Amino acid sequence: MKSKISEYTEKEFLEFVKDIYTNNKKKFPTEESHIQAVLEFKKLTEHPSGSDLLYYPNENREDSPAGVVKEVKEWRASKGLPGFKAG
């Protein structure tokens, strides 16, 4: 796994979020591996809401993987944090 969000393209990160959202058993065959992916999401995004972005979306956001990625992208930009790599 990549260690920084800036190592992901937006498309790659969206796929990662989709896999978490759907609990993709090919990517995360065990509950523990799924939990580790959620923890990795929290670490990568650095967002104060952490995994709540996945499970408890705010009312102003689309409840989907794309909505999660959009919120992360906008929040990181507003804080001057690096975004996704070009690609």
Curated annotation (Swiss-Prot):
Which family does the UniProt entry place this protein in? Belongs to the colicins ColE2/ColE8/ColE9 and pyocins S1/S2 family.
UniProt keyword Membrane present:
no
Q: Which InterPro entries match?
A: Colicin_E_sf (IPR035900), Colicin_pyocin (IPR000290)
Q: Which GO terms describe its biological process?
A: bacteriocin immunity
Query: Native species of this protein?
Result: Pseudomonas aeruginosa (strain ATCC 15692 / DSM 22644 / CIP 104116 / JCM 14847 / LMG 12228 / 1C / PRS 101 / PAO1)
Q: Which UniProt keywords apply?
A: Bacteriocin immunity
Q: Does the keyword Ligase apply?
A: no
Q: Which gene encodes it?
A: imm2
Q: Which GO terms describe its molecular function?
A: toxic substance binding
Name of this chain's protein: Pyocin-S2 immunity protein
